[in-house]
């Protein structure tokens, strides 16, 4: 039976945005954090999606909004407690996402031992590219990601540098929560995260696959 909702527009109906933190060793070092023994997980709401053409919004409560460039895995069917060996059978495709982060707020949350919700889960905190079918990326661990702010290269990394592989992450997450068709998993960011401000232009891409562009705005409320 054909899907009633197109995966090519997963951001319009997908329920869950699962994010993996500290999955590149170089980013762990730049954040002066300890390397994790298991994936570090947090969630964003579906209202965090900002498809290309819409702006990145700066929350009123932060003075230090950062970009984090990430490969996202788009789930193609319901996934519960799957093995690492079978995990890729549940993948429909990929996208490029930004995990926009209120870094000053996150730092305070860390100091107080609080969740990162205020720092990570605000409206438009997950800018997203077009959907890329699985067939167009035969090896998701052999990609080069890049990000520029106002034409200046900020982030450049290879997915081969992930600490936890995509099959491992899918299996791990699926044993904690059921993943549904249209859900995505953000797989972590390489080094080079940094601040953006109102009127900046963010460009990002996967070499040889796609690129995307966003304007940073401050909402009028």
Curated annotation (Swiss-Prot):
List localization entries: Mitochondrion; Cytoplasm, Cytosol
Query: How does the cofactor attach, per the note?
Result: Requires a divalent metal cation for activity.
Q: Which GO terms describe its biological process?
A: oxaloacetate metabolic process; pyruvate metabolic process
Give yes or no: UniProt keyword Transcription. no
| Family matches, as SUPFAM superfamilies | FAH
Q: Which cofactor does it need?
A: Mg(2+); Mn(2+)
N-terminal signal peptide: none
Source organism superkingdom: Eukaryota
Q: Which residues are reported to carry the modification Phosphoserine?
A: 37
Write down which residues bear the modification named N6-succinyllysine. 112
- The annotated transit peptide is positioned at 1-24
- Residues the record lists as binding Mg(2+): 68, 70, 99
Q: Which residues are recorded with the post-translational modification N6-acetyllysine? A: 110
GO MF, any single term: fumarylpyruvate hydrolase activity
Q: EC number(s) on record?
A: 5.3.2.2, 3.7.1.5, 4.1.1.112
Q: Which InterPro entries match?
A: Fumarylacetoacetase-like_C, Fumarylacetoacetase_C_sf
What is the activity regulation comment for this entry?
A: Oxaloacetate decarboxylation is competitively inhibited by oxalate.
GO cellular component, alphabetical, reads: cytosol; mitochondrion; nucleoplasm
What catalytic activity is recorded? oxaloacetate = enol-oxaloacetate; oxaloacetate + H(+) = pyruvate + CO2; a 3-acylpyruvate + H2O = a carboxylate + pyruvate + H(+); acetylpyruvate + H2O = acetate + pyruvate + H(+)
Q: Which UniProt keywords apply?
A: Acetylation, Cytoplasm, Hydrolase, Isomerase, Lyase, Magnesium, Manganese, Metal-binding, Mitochondrion, Phosphoprotein, Transit peptide
Q: What does this protein do?
A: Tautomerase that converts enol-oxaloacetate, a strong inhibitor of succinate dehydrogenase, to the physiological keto form of oxaloacetate. It is thereby required to maximize aerobic respiration efficiency by preventing succinate dehydrogenase inhibition. Also acts as a weak oxaloacetate decarboxylase (ODx), catalyzing the decarboxylation of oxaloacetate (OAA) to pyruvate and CO(2), and as such is likely a regulatory enzyme in the TCA cycle. Also displays acylpyruvase activity, being able to hydrolyze acetylpyruvate and fumarylpyruvate in vitro.
> What is its quaternary makeup?
Homodimer.
Sequence similarity: Belongs to the FAH family.
Q: What is this protein called?
A: Oxaloacetate tautomerase FAHD1, mitochondrial
Organism of derivation = Bos taurus (Bovine)
């Amino acid at each position: 039976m054909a899907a009633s909702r197109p995966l090519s527009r997963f951001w319009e109906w997908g329920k869950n945005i699962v994010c993996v933190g500290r999955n590149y060793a170089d980013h762990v070092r730049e954040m002066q954090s300890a390397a994790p023994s298991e994936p570090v997980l947090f969630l964003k709401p579906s209202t965090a999606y900002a498809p290309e053409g819409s702006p990145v919004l700066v929350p009123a409560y932060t003075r230090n909004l950062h970009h984090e460039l990430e490969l996202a895995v788009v789930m193609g069917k319901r996934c519960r407690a799957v093995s690492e060996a079978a995990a890729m059978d549940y993948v429909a495709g990929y996208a490029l996402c930004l995990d926009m982060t209120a870094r000053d707020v996150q730092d305070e949350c860390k100091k107080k031992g609080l969740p990162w919700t205020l720092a990570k889960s605000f409206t438009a905190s997950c800018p997203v590219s077009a959907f890329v079918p699985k067939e167009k990326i035969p090896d998701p661990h052999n990609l080069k990601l890049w990000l520029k702010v106002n034409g200046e290269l900020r982030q450049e990394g290879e997915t081969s540098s992930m600490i936890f592989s995509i099959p491992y992450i899918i299996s791990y997450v699926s044993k904690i929560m059921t993943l549904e068709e249209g859900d995505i998993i953000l797989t972590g960011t390489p080094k080079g995260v940094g601040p953006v401000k109102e009127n900046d232009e963010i460009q990002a891409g996967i070499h040889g696959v796609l690129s995307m562009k966003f304007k940073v705005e401050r909402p009028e409320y």
